[in-house]
Amino acid sequence: MCIALPYKYRIAPLYIYVEDKDVLSHIMPSKDDNANRIETKLNTLGLKLPEPLKVPTNVKTPFTWVRISGNKAYISGHGPQNPDGSVAGPFGKVGGGAVGESEVSVAQAYQAAKLAGLSILGSLKRELGNLDLVTGWLQVRGMVNAAAGFTQTTDVINGFSDLILTLYGPELGMHARSAIGVQALPLGLPVIIEALVEVSV
């Protein structure tokens, strides 16, 4: 078999003749090699991507969860979901003084941020078909439904960042990030996260 090297690797026309299929497989890996690498990692970690969000009937969503433009994917704000697509609790403000039924601990909010990450990955999978097509996590904006005076928003959104870095590694997964406290979030969610990623489409 004759292989023409891509232009950027040539100084002058160069052709290599390869007859051994094993050698050929190392020179030109199959498109299926390492296919679904990210989903394999998810399975190894015992994590499951949720079904599409089951939006409450009284909530209108005149927008798309993921918008592709060129090699960028703009991702709308996602909250935590259960595997069946329903909105995941607990609900209410994160932190605060008195312990109340509607309050959310930092540990619970960290887990909610992780679930929001899985929600985003689920939307990306439905849009791209393969999570391996994400070639870089560029920017993340995390919003925390913070009680008055709560300052541990960074600890909360680390739940998302830790997940992405575990799955994609620092080369692709390291991102610019904001973690801000807000007065309220839709449906009383403890966290909502939006992102900008680079994709290969």
Question: Where are the predicted features?
Answer:
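N-terminal polybasic/positive-inside topogenic patches
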Residues: 5-11, 15-17
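N-terminal presequence-like segments and the immediate start of the first folded domain
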Residues: 14-118, 122-141, 146-201
